[in-house]
Amino acid sequence: MIIVTGGAGLIGSNIIAALNDMGRRDILVVDNLTDGTKFVNLVDLDIADYCDKEDFIASIIAGDDFGDIDAIFHQGACSATTEWNGKYLMQNNYEYSKELLHYCLLREIPFFYASSAATYGDKTDFIEERQFEGPLNVYGYSKFLFDEYVRQILPQATSPVCGFKYFNVYGPREQHKGSMASVAFHLNNQMLKGENPKLFAGSEHFLRDFVYVGDVAKVNLWAWQHGISGIYNCGTGRAESFEQVARAVLNYHGKGEIETIPFPEHLKSRYQEYTQANLTKLRAAGYQAEFKSVAEGVAEYMQWLNRKS
């Protein structure tokens, strides 16, 4: 069996889709469907069972036996960088992850988890080491703290423990994220309403590493298949502008022009203006596949979003 936490979310559901493509159906999905809209991400996927997150955590703490587990992909967390309830975030993103990590270590189950480029804050080197990290929000801090915990444990681990610092992930199965969904998703919705795509003023200067979710799923499965341990960046290695994202959306629709709107005051001091994954460590570990550019990834995503049902 393979367990995917956050399996109804963006990255988790795409990992399940990739596992299905490999012929794996023996998948236990763990998630919190309080937001019932997320179920649509699972409708076309083949899984063995579903477990509520709270029930799963209780079982993990109790040390319950789930049978033979080939791997756990831990993608379940509060992913809202705008969430400021520190107690909630630390319970969801830190304490929960520690419990699951120790469950896996004790049973030598390969453990692959979601870290985040938010751990870097406004640093500009994006190298997977403590001195290059400085989160700007409590979400980033919760991820940073778990990375630090893993770094202490890795030398003694006898089974794979691998974290990926996800950069700006976009692609199919993110509609449930609302305001936290990708720029490409929101711009497409604006176009469907007959509006022009809107970007914050100055967006042509904001450069981000936008990584297609299908590529993220591939990296996770590669790490599992090769028994990889460590903490790695997961991005394209390219910094591209929000304007390039908008251009890709416009190219798909074949009409419209970019409009600018004022930049929100409350985001100014907490906004990463530049991200670009340093892939040196990932490449050294043996991952050689290419990552889609914004032009390639957004074009594929637009086809998926606008497919005929």
Swiss-Prot record:
E.C. code: 5.1.3.20
> What's the superkingdom here?
Bacteria
Q: Where does NADP(+) bind?
A: 10-11, 31-32, 38, 53, 75-79, 92, 143, 169, 177
The entry lists its GO molecular-function terms as: ADP-glyceromanno-heptose 6-epimerase activity; NADP binding
The alphabetized UniProt keywords are: Carbohydrate metabolism, Isomerase, NADP
Q: Which reaction does it catalyse?
A: ADP-D-glycero-beta-D-manno-heptose = ADP-L-glycero-beta-D-manno-heptose
Query: What cofactors are annotated for this protein?
Result: NADP(+)
Coiled-coil stretches are none
Q: What is annotated as the active site?
A: Y139, K177
Explain how, and how many, cofactor molecules are bound.
Binds 1 NADP(+) per subunit.
Tell me the enzyme class: isomerase
A Pfam family recorded for this sequence? Epimerase
- Pathway per the UniProt entry: Nucleotide-sugar biosynthesis; ADP-L-glycero-beta-D-manno-heptose biosynthesis; ADP-L-glycero-beta-D-manno-heptose from D-glycero-beta-D-manno-heptose 7-phosphate: step 4/4
The membrane-spanning stretches of this chain are: none
GO-annotated biological processes: ADP-L-glycero-beta-D-manno-heptose biosynthetic process; carbohydrate metabolic process
Q: Which family does it belong to?
A: Belongs to the NAD(P)-dependent epimerase/dehydratase family. HldD subfamily.
Free-text comment on this protein's domains from its UniProt entry:
Contains a large N-terminal NADP-binding domain, and a smaller C-terminal substrate-binding domain.
Main role?
Answer: Catalyzes the interconversion between ADP-D-glycero-beta-D-manno-heptose and ADP-L-glycero-beta-D-manno-heptose via an epimerization at carbon 6 of the heptose.
For this entry, the protein name equals ADP-L-glycero-D-manno-heptose-6-epimerase
Q: Which organism is it from?
A: Histophilus somni (strain 2336) (Haemophilus somnus)
Give the organism's phylogenetic lineage. Bacteria, Pseudomonadati, Pseudomonadota, Gammaproteobacteria, Pasteurellales
